[in-house]
A protein has these predicted regions:
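Conserved acidic residues
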Residues: 30, 86, 114
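Short internal beta-strands
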Residues: 56-61, 67-72, 117-118
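Short active-site-adjacent helix-start/loop capping segments
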Residues: 41-44, 50-52, 65-68, 76-80, ...
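Terminal domain-start leader segments
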Residues: 1-62
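Structural motif
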Residues: 37, 72-73, 118-123
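Compact, glycine/acidic-enriched structural inserts
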Residues: 66-95
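Short, solvent-exposed amphipathic alpha-helical segments in soluble enzyme
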Residues: 48-50, 85-86, 132-135
Length: 156
């Protein structure tokens, strides 16, 4: 994709994703669903202005699995301008079952059983999104990955 407003090259984001996958595996998780805009930006460069709408970056712990992004349909042009990610799924606000969509994409990425991390402490994850998402992900066990995902950005 052409990303005229990307802050970093794709190679930098792929390195970040690789480090994220390493931490995900170390934590014994099958993958993660990132909902916090700051984590999504850090990992794929998508600079969301719609942080108040549901979004999700689905990452498998497996290195050969490409991440997928679920966003509102009207936000797609901004993804194309700021990120290299190609697997982007869109939903229509108030018309789509977003939690089911995110869970279905997670299953497509091989996340069907075991433990999955979500940045549960994010302001971008209100109860109206969190509760149906946890239910839709069953039988997977949801774990709080807020610290795991946030720690990727620490400067040592």
């Amino acid at each position: 994709m052409d990303q005229p407003f990307a802050a970093f090259p794709e190679s930098e984001h792929r390195e970040r994703l690789s480090r994220a996958r390493e931490k995900i595996r170390e934590a014994g998780l099958a993958g993660c669903i990132c909902v916090a805009p700051e984590n999504i930006y850090y990992l794929i460069g998508y600079d969301s202005i719609a942080y108040f709408n549901y979004q999700a970056l689905i990452i498998s712990a497996e290195e050969d699995s490409e991440p997928a992004l679920v966003i509102r349909n009207v936000d797609l042009p901004l993804v194309k301008e700021t990120s290299w990610i190609e697997d982007v799924r869109t939903y229509h606000l108030h018309a789509s079952d977003i939690a089911k969509m995110v869970a279905d994409v997670a299953r497509e990425k091989g996340l069907r059983e075991g433990r999955i991390g979500i940045d549960l402490q994010s302001y971008a994850l209100p109860g109206a999104y969190a509760l149906p998402l946890v239910k839709a992900l069953e039988p997977m066990q949801v774990e709080d990955a807020t610290e795991l995902l946030g720690s990727l950005q620490y400067i040592k």
